[in-house]
Regions:
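N-terminal glycine/serine-rich phosphate-binding loop of ATP-dependent small-molecule kinases
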Residues: 9-116
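Conserved small/polar residues in nucleotide/adenosyl-binding loops
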Residues: 121-123
């Protein structure tokens, strides 16, 4: 039976310590030809838990006769997914972004973008 103030302090401190054992979250952003998604992962009871927290549509647009990615919009979608993490109280400690390997953008000597962000038809 718990009946002393010191016993109650110990129990309270155990509950506080348990509440402070928050999960460590990791974010994976997968950007594909037709959609993108944010997957948040963490470990729970020795198992990896994955949760899709944000999804968006994707596709190329024709610009100057070339198929191009809307890089600024894609960047904004990544930021929107990060905002969703904050909204649900699951802030990642790290993030990785996966995209395509055959599309390109040209840079000048100062690493400034020259021209469009060119994509190939993913068919």
């Amino acid at each position: 039976m718990i009946n002393t103030t010191s016993d109650m302090k110990v129990i309270r401190s155990l509950h506080i310590e348990e509440d402070l054992k928050m999960a460590t979250y990791y974010l994976a952003v997968d950007i594909g030809a037709s959609s993108g998604r944010h997957i948040l992962g963490h470990m729970e009871n020795g198992k990896m838990i994955l949760e899709e927290i944000y999804r968006f549509e994707n596709g190329m647009v024709k610009k100057d006769g070339e198929l191009c990615w809307e890089f600024d919009r894609l960047f904004n979608e990544i930021v929107n997914g990060l905002k969703k993490c904050k909204e649900i109280g699951k802030i990642p400690v790290s993030m990785g972004v996966d995209t395509w390997g055959v599309d390109f953008v040209l840079l000048d000597k100062d690493e400034k973008v020259i021209g469009n962000k060119i994509g190939r038809a993913h068919v």
